[in-house]
Regions:
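N-terminal helix-rich module
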Residues: 4-41, 45, 50-132
Length: 132
């Protein structure tokens, strides 16, 4: 009985790093979809790229390229230790076409990582790392 209670309790305790990374992934998915919608509606070529931290102390972040200046989307992670890597290319292409290439971005925070992706038609979402 005690073993079952301990097992259930350990499953209920989430790793705080995993939770932070999951929040970053959900936030990034929403930002990517917002930029994708703007790209389609305005006929703009919009790209997203991760920006590494630099030697001057600027934290890692990301940049949307091609959006109108009045549309100010965030450029920093909520957790400054987050790192991102676009898989197979330097940037994500978010428009102007409704059907974009299948794309993925790997997010890392400490030892945790999550893969965010789209098949080109569906919205960006967390996908299993074993998915093609």
């Amino acid at each position: 009985m005690i073993a079952i209670a301990v097992g259930v309790a350990s499953l209920a305790l989430r790793d705080p790093v995993a939770g932070r990374l999951e929040r970053e992934a959900m936030r990034l998915a929403a930002l990517l979809e917002s930029a994708r919608t703007e790209a389609r509606s305005a006929g703009l070529v919009v790209r997203w790229r991760p920006v590494p931290a630099d030697d001057r102390g600027t934290p890692a972040g990301f940049r949307f390229e091609g959006l109108p200046p009045q549309l100010k989307l965030p450029q920093r992670w909520l957790a400054s230790e987050v790192r991102a890597e676009v898989i197979g290319r330097p940037v994500l292409l978010l428009g102007p076409e409704a059907m974009i290439p299948a794309q993925r971005v790997l997010l890392r925070l400490g030892a945790e990582q999550l893969l965010l992706g789209t098949d080109g038609l569906a919205p960006f979402a967390v996908v299993p790392e074993t998915a093609p």
